[in-house]
Amino acid sequence: VHLTGEEKAAVTSLWGKVNVDEVGGEALGRLLVVYPWTQRFFDSFGDLSSPDAVMGNPKVKAHGKKVLNSFSEGLKNLDNLKGTFAKLSELHCDKLHVDPENFKLLGNVLVCVLAHHFGKEFTPQVQAAYQKVVAGVANALAHKYH
């Protein structure tokens, strides 16, 4: 991902204020509610029968935290996202058979959740920088697909 120094500073500054537990669960939960076909990858998560069930599901929250912890690693390695996410790309491609389009959807949902949490602090410039990052992460996660 090619970010200016200003964009990198904006992304890392805001990310330092993110509650990974809360935002991760909310982002994954919203993905599963807004794009219900993504639920098929989470059969083992139990009750996903309604928006309230999804948003309150402890397995959704735990996996959302895991996802955002991986995203945090990506932010530390913006110049090598493909390398950072190589193993996760392989896992999601070869073993889990996740549609790589879902990575883009989750990235966009994450941007919406960040905007909701940070309000005026999430300026158009910050959003533009985050859109670049989530697109780069989605591309890195889709890298092993053929």
From Swiss-Prot:
The modification N6-acetyllysine is found at K59, K82, K144. PROSITE patterns: GLOBIN. The modification N-acetylvaline is found at V1. InterPro entries: Globin, Globin-like_sf, Globin/Proto, Hemoglobin_b, Hemoglobin_oxygen_transport. Residues 2-146 form the Globin domain. Red blood cells. It comes from the Eukaryota. It holds the Pfam family Globin. One of its GO terms (cellular component) is hemoglobin complex. GO terms for molecular function: haptoglobin binding; heme binding; hemoglobin alpha binding; metal ion binding; organic acid binding; oxygen binding; oxygen carrier activity; peroxidase activity. GO terms for biological process: hydrogen peroxide catabolic process. The modification Phosphoserine is found at S44. Belongs to the globin family. Heterotetramer of two alpha chains and two beta chains. This is Hemoglobin subunit beta. It comes from Lutra lutra.
